[in-house]
């Protein structure tokens, strides 16, 4: 399955999610041993080239400076990146910050975390509205049959007869499986060039190979479907 598609696949604004859901238990605080480290919120001097938006701060959590993050993917479906990454980048309007994360854990369908330098509820509450980014290199490794959506965006799609079908422009999660949005050049009713879209289920019966190195996906799908 896959996580939520943010609909913005530009560099540094990529959508996020994994293909196959795996159950993950996060009863214990991740990396709790780092809680004694010191740090603070800092203005982001450099924005990572591989920054991927993974959620947004929606509320304070508790009284000791923890924040609650609504994630674009649940734990086990890609949201684990928030639990693994020890450094987050935050954006709200023109304001950009970087912060070290002391502790984090899954909480219901959200992630709660303690940013370094945020010591009380008021300071945590003031962080509402920040969009949360982590580096792609901080994503947890996936099994051979799993893919992050961010890695599929822009790949060429061809069928088994090597007919070009377009490029992956986005992904949709319909609650049962993922669906690729494949854009291709077309001609409008007025004869002018336009862009059309194919929707191809991202399931094994249709998706035969995903070659990220070659940036190509081979599917069992005809051009006139």
Curated annotation (Swiss-Prot):
Primary localization class, coarse: cytoplasm
Gene Ontology cellular-component annotations: cytoplasm; ribosome
Domain PRC barrel: 144-225
Keywords: Chaperone, Cytoplasm, Ribosome biogenesis, rRNA processing
GO biological process, any: ribosomal small subunit biogenesis
Location in or out of the cell: Cytoplasm
Gene3D superfamilies associated with the record: PRC-barrel domain (2.30.30.240), RimM (2.40.30.60)
InterPro entries found in the cross-reference section: PRC_barrel-like_sf (IPR011033), PRC_RimM (IPR056792), RimM (IPR011961), RimM_N (IPR002676), RimM_N_sf (IPR036976), Transl_B-barrel_sf (IPR009000)
GO MF annotations in UniProt: ribosome binding
NCBIfam families for this protein: 16S_RimM
Biological role: An accessory protein needed during the final step in the assembly of 30S ribosomal subunit, possibly for assembly of the head region. Essential for efficient processing of 16S rRNA. May be needed both before and after RbfA during the maturation of 16S rRNA. It has affinity for free ribosomal 30S subunits but not for 70S ribosomes.
Assembly description: Binds ribosomal protein uS19.
Free-text note on domains in this protein's UniProt record: The PRC barrel domain binds ribosomal protein uS19.
Family, as annotated: Belongs to the RimM family.
Protein name in the entry: Ribosome maturation factor RimM
Species of the source: Burkholderia lata (strain ATCC 17760 / DSM 23089 / LMG 22485 / NCIMB 9086 / R18194 / 383)
